[in-house]
């Protein structure tokens, strides 16, 4: 069983530092494509000031030189969903569960185990980079598929941006969860609350040591419970009354 979550733009560079892993050839190819930009071009590419682009340029150079500080992916990414995952003071058993079952999807490093060491960077699949003449999604598709190859159970807590990197054959095997609130008899999806609920789902799965996705249906997560009457085979609805 694999649980897929997306990377985040917000980063916590106060996280613990770990030993760097060798960069994959794909990651090097992307970094070299970014390195080819002038400072002005990089600022335009990212949609940021040249002052901030200089920070990114320094990060790119440090990564290629092997001198960048690296942090566990699960602890470096710090968006709302990540802040809603229990990450501090975990037992060895809890960390082992996350390392075995949780995969983090990124545009620079591909698909990562929870505690893989990575460096701060700025890149997502909406950016118009063409490593090896391909879009970022096309560039990573084969590696993304290989990351879950042979897995019978795949739970996607991904946004469509990241999910679409996988081939159609893999996407058709994924189970997705939607978190909906009952507001006066109308079911609504709230982006912020959904992000928090996805983080709470990761925590609940870790605490309960879930390895069979069917067992999710008996969980209550941040006030959300499974609704069989609203769910489909591959789309499970959790409702907060």
What spans do the regions from the language model cover?
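Active-site helix-to-loop segments that bind/position phosphate- or nucleotide-bearing substrates
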Residues: 2-89
């Amino acid at each position: 069983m694999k649980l897929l979550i997306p990377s985040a733009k917000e980063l916590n560079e106060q996280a613990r530092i770990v030993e760097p892993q060798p960069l994959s050839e794909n990651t090097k190819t992307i970094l070299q494509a970014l390195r080819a930009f002038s400072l002005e071009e990089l600022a335009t590419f990212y949609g940021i000031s040249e002052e901030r682009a200089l920070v990114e340029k320094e990060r790119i150079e440090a990564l290629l030189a092997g001198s960048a500080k690296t942090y566990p992916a699960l602890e470096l990414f710090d968006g709302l969903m990540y802040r809603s995952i229990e990450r501090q003071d975990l037992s060895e058993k809890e960390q082992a569960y996350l390392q075995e079952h949780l995969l983090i999807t990124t545009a620079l490093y591909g698909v990562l185990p929870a505690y893989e060491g990575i460096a701060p960077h700025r890149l997502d699949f909406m950016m118009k980079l063409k490593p090896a003449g391909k879009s970022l999604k096309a560039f990573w598709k084969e590696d993304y598929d290989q990351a879950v190859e042979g897995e019978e159970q795949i739970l996607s807590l991904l946004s469509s941006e990241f999910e679409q990197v996988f081939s159609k054959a893999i996407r058709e095997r994924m189970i997705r969860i939607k978190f909906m609130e009952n507001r006066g008899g109308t079911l609504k999806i709230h982006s912020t609350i959904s992000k928090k609920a996805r983080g709470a789902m990761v925590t609940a799965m870790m605490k309960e040591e879930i390895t069979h996705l069917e067992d999710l249906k008996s969980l209550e997560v941040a006030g959300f419970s499974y609704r069989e009457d609203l769910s489909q085979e591959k789309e499970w609805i959790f409702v907060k009354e």
